[in-house]
Amino acid sequence: MKFTSNTLLFALSVAPVAAFTNPSPWSASSATTTALNAERSSNNVFSTFCATAAMSALLWGSPGMLAEPANNHQLPFGLNEIVQQNVVASAKDKASATGSRVNKDAESLLRLGLPIESKEVRELQSSLEGIKQDVASKRKGPAADGAKKVKSILASKKADKMAAVCRDAKVCTATMKEINDLMDPLEKAIKASQDAFTGSLEERDALDKAYNAQVKAAKLLTTLEEQMVPKGYKTPVPSQYSDLPQLEQRATVEMLIKKGEAGAQFDINGVNFPEARMTMVIDGYTSPVTGGNFVDLVNKGFYDNMPIQRSDGFVVQTGDPDGEAVGYTGGKAGKAIGEGPKGERLIPCEISIVGDKMPIYETTIEDEGRGGEATILPFSAYGAMGWARDEYDPNSGSSQFFWLLFDSDLTPAGKNVLDGRYPCFGYVVEGADFLQDVKEGDVIVSAKVTEGLQYLKQPN
């Protein structure tokens, strides 16, 4: 069975790159170097062209690359299909990009995916998140201006408007005060970095402090925005899927992976780790059925002791159990979709589009004639989680999923062509760097739901 996208562009867009998830942008990590180089070279058309041409030559020049895999794993794209077409999706509302900059911050994307309508908090989010980008690129003046803008917003009537739409105004008021208080040490750290010699330890230390203050403030921003989700809010789901598990809000899953070879360790930018620990946020607002299915399987222990079945530099994939079945067979199949050829519990393809009140089901954006529209959660962050399915059947997904290894340098802003074809149901928010060395044969020791299990709704 194959699982494909339909464009050469996507194949050219997803080379392995470390996520920008380190506690400090100045640690000796190639992940940081990658992020900074991406920023500095974002307008280097020639380098992008060369990289694209090199990948094209690889695909066209290696017939073996086009062979179908000799296994049952559902794949997120087939190279034989990719080289036949060159279809580019031109996003109208770029959820995955602003201007020419691709938003590859998983936590930012999750905030943008919340069902809230406060223009004031989105303005606050834009200013606060901009500080992180400016600090990482040593744009010290703009970073300082961003901190002043955050304080200005929080000192204005906009703060009252934000508190007014919270479920608990007191919680939001206190949270906004904490964010505001963090701007003082952030500004002080930026000023210290401006006074230090470029490249000095003093500059690095000051930028570390500024970066860490922004990270703390951003986590508080998440708390603030989550308070703005209306009480009891649930994404509408058609009644025909009521016999499938559903996730009504968000859940957090922690996963522990070890090397398949005894004694082997994960090599992350020259540092060895005996195990890989990742934290993922699963989104039930945009993917109630897909997210519910995944959280249900995690809670059942389905992924415990399961090997990684694919790692090719584009994706890391798992979820295919032993035996003839290519998905989960332990539960009752839903009536609307039915079961797979080997008794697999199947779920419908589920896509949430910007501006819609509920997801579309059993189809894709292209099949709906809405090609180019933006999805709420895009495949634009390293470690974005996608639901695998058969190439030509949108409703053949069961238990296989993948983490996307995303490289924004080769993906034009707003043109990630997985969006709208496959559900993006969550992101890795901690430990995404480990994905660069998770290989086929490595083993998921355990996967556990650590938060949000109460939001998993089982069929009656």
Enumerate the language-model features and the residues they cover.
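Cyclophilin-like peptidyl-prolyl cis-trans isomerases
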Residues: 68-460
